[in-house]
Regions:
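Classical nucleotidyltransferase
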Residues: 1-18
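Conserved hydrophobic/aromatic beta-strand scaffold that supports enzyme active sites
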Residues: 33-37, 55, 77, 85-87
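Short beta-strand His + acidic residue motifs that chelate non-heme Fe in jelly-roll/DSBH
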Residues: 45-47, 65-67, 87-88, 94-101, ...
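Short glycine/proline-enriched turns and hinge-like loops at secondary-structure junctions
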Residues: 48-50, 57-58, 80, 98-101
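Glycine- and acidic-residue-biased ligand/ion/polar-headgroup-sensing regions
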Residues: 51-71
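Short acidic-glycine-tyrosine-enriched beta hairpin
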Residues: 69-93
Length: 130
């Protein structure tokens, strides 16, 4: 580990998930900033939030995003690469997938009436092969 990684681990709370991990970098009542690290060949659930918007900034690597403003049947796949940004508004379905052999790092800015992990509806998980 580099000294910057050791400092980050000491300063910020890390949470592990099946798709990777994230650090909570900053938090206020209506705002939260995270660093998401999506591991190679992993992905998140196809999900939406009712009380918050999210802005994603890809800081390292690239990923695919399944995205729909309304229904799962209308989803589109887009690719995000380093320094790309993407806006997900509340109630819009979204899923990050990393099909590559290297990590994808994303700075996620959440803002809205509620910025906690309970504000989520999942349609399906990454490993369900949809």
């Amino acid at each position: 580990n580099s000294s910057s990684e050791i400092l980050k681990n000491w300063n910020y709370q890390k949470e592990k998930r099946i798709w990777g991990e994230f650090y909570n970098l900053f938090e206020e009542k209506y705002l939260k900033v995270k660093e998401l690290i999506v591991f190679p060949n992993q992905g998140m659930s196809f999900q939406r939030h009712f009380h918050r918007n999210e802005i994603w900034f890809v800081s390292e690597g690239s990923c695919k995003v399944n995205y729909s403003k309304s229904t799962e049947e209308e989803k589109k796949e887009i690719t995000l690469t380093k320094f790309d940004t993407f806006l997900v508004k509340k109630n819009e379905w979204h899923q990050i997938i990393n099909p590559h052999q290297t990590e994808c790092k994303i700075i996620e800015i959440q803002y809205g009436d509620k910025v906690d992990e309970s504000d989520i509806e999942r349609l399906y998980y990454f490993n369900e092969g949809k």
